[in-house]
Amino acid sequence: MKKKISPSVMCADFFDLKNCIRQFEESKIDMLHVDIMDGSFVPNYTLGTDFVKILKANTAIPLDIHLMVENPESKLDWFQLSADDYVAVHCESTPHIHKAVAAVKNKGCRALAALNPGTPICALENITDDIDGVLVMTVDPGFAGQRLI
């Protein structure tokens, strides 16, 4: 599996976002990581659907949409997803991880499983054939700027 570079937009300077995006494009990164939080699965709220639309309108870099939300399979229609996009879902965010992965695939996107630091890798056993990759979390989900675990 090829490793891909996906810097987090959440850590960008929002007052200089156009310049940040230009620098990302010049750096030829693989994709942009966009954290979506609902205040339920994680205690924080962040970037939402309008922000994703703005990004899509201003860059051709594929998006890596990290859904830190309850029941992510029911939220996919909120986003204008394209075949270049990756969508990461957490096993803990839904009682039916297979359905969540299938819903991402049905949108034509690549499905990623997000693996929290405290989640054993065996949690992915039953979906390894269905996913396109793994987002390995180096911090507990929910807040930027944490120390790596």
Task: Give the location of each predicted region.
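Short active-site-adjacent helix-start/loop capping segments
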Residues: 40-43, 64, 71-76, 95-97
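Short, compositionally biased "basic patch" segments
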Residues: 23-26, 64
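Conserved anion-binding
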Residues: 13-16, 58, 74-75, 82-149
